Amino acid sequence: MVRMEDIISLAKRKGFVFQSSEVYGGLSGAWDYGPLGVELKKNIKSEWWKSMVYLHENIVGLDSAIFMRPEIWRASGHIDGFSDSMVDCKDCKSRFRADFIDLSKNCPNCKVGNNFTSPRSFNLMFKTHIGVVEDSSSEIYLRPETAQGIFVNFRNVLDSSRLKIPFGIAQVGKAFRNEIVTKNFIFRTCEFEQMEMQFFVHPKQIDEWFCYWQQNRMNFFIETLKIRPDKLRFKAHDSTQLAHYAKSAFDIEYEFPFGFQEVEGIHNRGNYDLTQHSKFSNNPKIFEYHDLLTKERYVPHVIETSAGLTRSVLMTLCNAYSEEELSDGDKRIVLRLHPKLAPYKIAIFPLVKKVELVEIARRIYIELCDDFHIFYDDSGTIGKRYRRQDEIGTPYCVTVDYSTIEDETVTVRERNNMTQKRIFINDLYSYIKTEILNYKEDFNK
């Protein structure tokens, strides 16, 4: 069983995630992504973008501003309705989301009897000011979701891209929520990244497309990110759990070390958002769709897929982490990342730091670095270098040895099963490409 302390230790030690502002004592719930973290995050984002935009001819991309006019958040219902209920323990002063604890039992922190304040509403949006004068006219918000930037650009995208219903708009970007409690490492934070797609459909086709996107998104986690199927599940929202904009919703949950938690939501938003913006902007035609074939005019309904990029990073680390007992009694830590997600695809080693071996290793690096992100390492024993790459998920290690000088072959060592093959240098590119393309994960290991 994977433990969170092992994931956190690896993430910090190897440069996936660092505590933000650490030299000043750190900032609770804020994290910086290190050299390996930014690569893993970029690779997940790239696979998501490919699955949404490149593999669907009727989905296009958008990158909307973080700052938007406050009227947008008034129309969307976030100013009045985007809040959580919170309570405080009167004894230890700890603060909790009311829906995260049993108020009839002892405080989870101090274990004293149920001595809580009455639940009170807490708006999750960060408010700030824009301009030189701080008054009500200059109030502005950090966006709590990326979706509204898509909705207010509905007409711009529709007209400029010459799209027809059904179509989607995809976006990856940062969102901000003043969470009552930040916890579980990078899982719940005030600053995070979302991967969202809003799919606009005819009202009569909403159920059909909702089912399609449910299955499509589950397949993405299993087939593309190679998440263990037994660690994933659907969870339906009941009426008390629905967001103010949703008619129905399903979460895709992953079994983290701290239990099953949401990594993506699929929501039937109906025509709530477009209708609200048509009312508040006094411009209903902008949010209306005119079908030239049927002559029908209507406000499209929306299916939303909303995944947490930062949560997906944590899920991927938990899913890939393993510890193995070797035949010599030693322990090996391995990140079994899909090669497409691995921060480095290849590590290149000269067996020893001799000029003739280093020159060949450097030549291979230069020949392949346009196509693969490569780590070069010539220090330490070859065994230790292998172990270092296993820990960060590098799928293939290429070793240049004395035989290379004679026959232009190198040793390619595979991460998961540690098998080694001799490959001609001229065949390295095609060999690695084929291996990545045909990669299969054995979920029984």
Swiss-Prot record:
Compartments where found: Cytoplasm
PROSITE patterns: AA_TRNA_LIGASE_II
One GO cellular component, as annotated: cytoplasm
Binding site for ATP: 177-179, 187-192, 262-263, 308-311
BP GO terms, sorted: glycyl-tRNA aminoacylation
Keyword Chaperone: no
Keyword Cell division: no
NCBIfam families from the UniProt entry: glyS_dimeric (TIGR00389), PRK04173.1 (NF003211)
PANTHER family in the record: DNA POLYMERASE SUBUNIT GAMMA-2, MITOCHONDRIAL, GLYCYL-TRNA SYNTHETASE/DNA POLYMERASE SUBUNIT GAMMA-2
Subunit structure: Homodimer.
Name of the protein in question: Glycine--tRNA ligase
Biological source species: Borrelia garinii subsp. bavariensis (strain ATCC BAA-2496 / DSM 23469 / PBi) (Borreliella bavariensis)
Lineage: Bacteria, Pseudomonadati, Spirochaetota, Spirochaetia, Spirochaetales
